Amino acid sequence: MVEESIHSSIEVIIFAGMTKHSAGLLLYRFREGVLEVFLVHPGGPFWEKKDLGVWSIPKGEIDKGEDPLDAARREFEEETGFRPEGIFRELTPVRQRSGKIVHAWAVEGDCDAAAIQSNTFTLQWPPHWGSQQEFPEVDRAGWFSVDRAKEKILDGQRGLLAQLELVLRGEGKHQ
């Protein structure tokens, strides 16, 4: 009953029509004692030569009536081809520069960043006179130390990395 009430409240907030909301997963692992996070690079010609400050957690918009965690899991799978399992730790939502609110969950896991299989989108390229072309939503992925990830990730998502470190520190898994 309480869970239904919370879900209904979240849905009212998400679909009030004023702010866009997306949901994603912050996948993490430990390699030789170093905390690493999994980030994706947006596909398409606009992002092709951009690197620092454009990477993201795998995420996407929440469909009407969809549970935000279910949306996060769906989006991760659509953008990477992988479906992480484990304990999903809800993080405090962050607001990106665009105004979009990102709901995120941290989950420990592993996947081969070189083996991602992303969904695609269609775009007229070049704009105004080019032809319709298909591009991957995500063109590459990588595992990064938290310090390196702070350089790579969108400014508005950097707070998710700090939250992950705090959660893991509280569990005695990170210094």
Regions found by a protein language model. Name each.
Residues 17-56, 105:
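N-terminal strand-loop-strand
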Residues 147-175:
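Charged phosphate-binding loop/patch that engages nucleotide di/tri-phosphates or the phosphate backbone
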